[in-house]
Design a protein with these regions (language model features):
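Short intrinsically disordered terminal tails
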Residues: 1, 81-82
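Charged/polar positions within long, soluble alpha-helices
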Residues: 15-26, 44-58, 76, 80
Length: 82
């Protein structure tokens, strides 16, 4: 597992989640559009952490456009019925 890559993306996701929670609590004008942008950003990082967990450091650094699109998709190899 590429722990550095996973940790980077989980940290980014955590920061977005913290920011979103803060904005929902403190900003009465926070709207649907802002929420969509925040959740898209959050899922991008969570999904990338999972989908690219085993890529080499070199591949993570070079990250092609195809890699970027593939890694940010919802995982297909996680059982969500638990």
């Amino acid at each position: 597992m590429n722990k550095d890559h996973v940790l980077f993306h989980l940290q980014e996701a955590r920061e977005e989640l913290d920011r979103t929670i803060r904005d929902l609590r403190e900003n009465p004008g926070y709207d649907y559009g802002e929420f969509v942008v925040a959740m898209t950003h959050l899922y991008h990082h969570v999904n990338t952490a999972w989908n690219a967990r085993d890529v080499s450091h070199e591949r993570a650094e070079t990250c092609s456009e195809d890699d970027f699109r593939q890694w940010r998709q919802f995982p297909t190899d996680l059982e969500m019925s638990v």
